[in-house]
Regions:
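Short hydrophobic/aromatic beta-strand micro-patches
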Residues: 2-4, 69-71
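N-terminal first-folded block
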Residues: 4, 9-29
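Conserved active-site tyrosine of GNAT-family acetyltransferases
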Residues: 11-16, 82, 107-110
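Ser/Thr-centric signal marking residues that sit
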Residues: 16, 38, 72
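Vicinal oxygen chelate
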Residues: 22-69, 77-106, 117-123
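Short glycine-/small-residue motifs
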Residues: 112-115
């Protein structure tokens, strides 16, 4: 997955600092982050516009087309840390009927980020 971002340094600070992802590679306006199971790439809006030979609009905050989700050990702690680091909160930690505790924040470019923790239920 490639996320289009306005400011690569700001996005890297969020994803490496606040979410703890490891920088795998950076070259100019492009970077890859190691999520553990896969890679998340970041590419600046201006560079992607040049690649596609078109102007790209920023995503609308009230109409997300997708979310980026990460599993964490403790949603409450991760949510508190993300908000303390400046991530705008969207939904506070909530137990979901599908067996997870989830919370949502926005990254510096307005992308919806979900953090999820599996709940252990007795059978």
């Amino acid at each position: 997955m490639i996320l289009i971002v306005e400011d690569l340094d700001r996005a890297l600070h969020f994803y490496t600092g606040a979410l703890g992802l490891r920088l795998g590679h950076r070259s100019g306006d492009y970077a890859q982050l190691d999520t553990g199971a896969t890679r998340l790439a970041l590419y600046t809006r201006s560079a992607m516009g040049k690649t596609l030979d078109m102007s790209l609009d920023a995503p609308a905050a009230n109409a997300p087309g997708f979310e980026v989700g990460f599993k964490v050990a403790d949603v409450d702690a991760a949510f508190s840390e993300l908000v303390a680091r400046g991530a705008p909160p969207v939904v506070s930690p909530t137990d979901r009927f599908w067996g997870q505790r989830t919370a949502y924040v926005r990254d510096p470019d307005g992308h919806l980020v979900e953090i999820a923790q599996d709940l252990h239920r007795s059978r």
